[in-house]
Amino acid sequence: MKTRYEDDSLTLHTDLYQINMVEAYWKDGIHNRKAVFDVYFRRLPFGNGYAIFAGLERVIQYLDDFHFSETDLDYLHKEVGYGQEFIDYLRTIRFTGNIRSMVEGELAFGNEPLLRVEAPLAEAQIIETAILNIVNYQTLIATKASRIKQVVGNEVAMEFGSRRAHELDAAIWGTRAAYIGGFQSTSNVRAGKLFGIPVSGTHAHSLVQAYKDEYIAFNKYAETHKDCVFLVDTYDTLKSGVPTAIKVAKEFGDRINFIGIRLDSGDLAYLSKKARKMLDEAGFPNAKIVASNDLDEYTIMNLKAQGAKIDMWGIGTKLITAFDQAALGGVYKLVSIEDEKGQMTDTIKISGNPEKLTTPGMKKVYRIINKNNNKSEGDYITLDDENPQEEDRLKMFHPVHTYISKFVTDFEARELHQDIFKEGRLVYQLPNLQTIQEYATKNLELLWDEYKRSLNPEKYPVDLSQKCWENKMKNIEKVKQSFHF
């Protein structure tokens, strides 16, 4: 059977149970009641000390074009079995709500809202799957990229992962997220076109194999490409590859820009040191050594500890697949809903797993920045009607272990959420990708080094205001009393 993509909208990119719930709301007449959902994750990925928020641009694209196509509706009616009246209702759905969100490149931490959805219940429900799909993946990859870039430091980090990504869209949106996280280029030409990311690349072993001779292959490559990085490990790196690269570079002289060589196998620490010596002695002290071959932050850390002479890092599989953590685990939880009297009432989910307890109510997230050293003291979650900037002395305390507390003075309370959609209308001006990357990099300066350690980082504080904490406790008690816990 041929898969048909014509008239394929992303609106059906949802779980069946979302549509089932919408049908139940619609039949009961509560589908237009205002609802508020928070998007957040509970635990930081990779054991990291922070996350980098990404995915907002695609969320905007998704919501801005939110509608069921006629083929969507035909499928839901004929193949899934929804009734015609409900199908007619679905035909009218557009996103008419409000979105407040962190902007891309923002530092994010566990149990704080990344994004808040306020919309009629049916609309807010049906968009859950796609929003989580987008934000979970892109935030995961941006965070992985940032971890790697922290280890790479001032050297160049290049994204090489397309062939190992989980399908085509994962490759390009993962590349975009990696750029937000600090990578300087991508090998994916489509991502370069779509997002303006600088593209970079060398050549494969197949070039050398096609000519059966490194000298001929390097010559043919140099004849067609002025900027040359030769892959030197097809046969023997030190006996053949590096000497041949040097020979061709000398013969071509000023006719090419001999950028350097790439190592893709073997002991990268040993080979890079030997190759560096050979290049220097041949009169190419500025030639760069590029390394690839299943690299990640841990391998790079070890190579640096062993004195590897590597200038540029091509990272693929373990970046684009977030190799050591398959998913972020972001969730989408109802925190407030309009009742039959038209009043907003807070909702809470209580679980046998304490980490799954939600924080009810419409909230704001602030970053508390010490004015004396421009470092963050922690993030501070308040109810919607609070403004910590009005406080001269702010008490910050652990939301579970409340005896852990501190007072902060002389601070700036920076609100992390901005209006993205208001009543279904996009009100946010998307920055370009370079600006987002610069913002992410600048944000990292707010953190002490202890929070940025690759291994066993210090836990960053995410605290509730007294009022927000009391509201949470009140809602817990209300639920316990209603169910006679």
Sequence positions of predicted segments:
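Short coil/turn segments at secondary-structure boundaries
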Residues: 74-75, 143-147, 161, 452-459
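Gly/Ser/Thr/Ala-enriched C-terminal appendages of enzymes
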Residues: 2-33, 37, 46-48, 295-485
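Alpha-helix initiation/capping motif
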Residues: 15, 55, 68-72, 76, ...
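Hydrophobic residues within beta-strands of alpha/beta enzymes
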Residues: 200, 261, 289, 311-313
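Buried, small/hydrophobic-residue-enriched core segments of structured protein domains
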Residues: 2-34, 43-45, 81, 87-96, ...
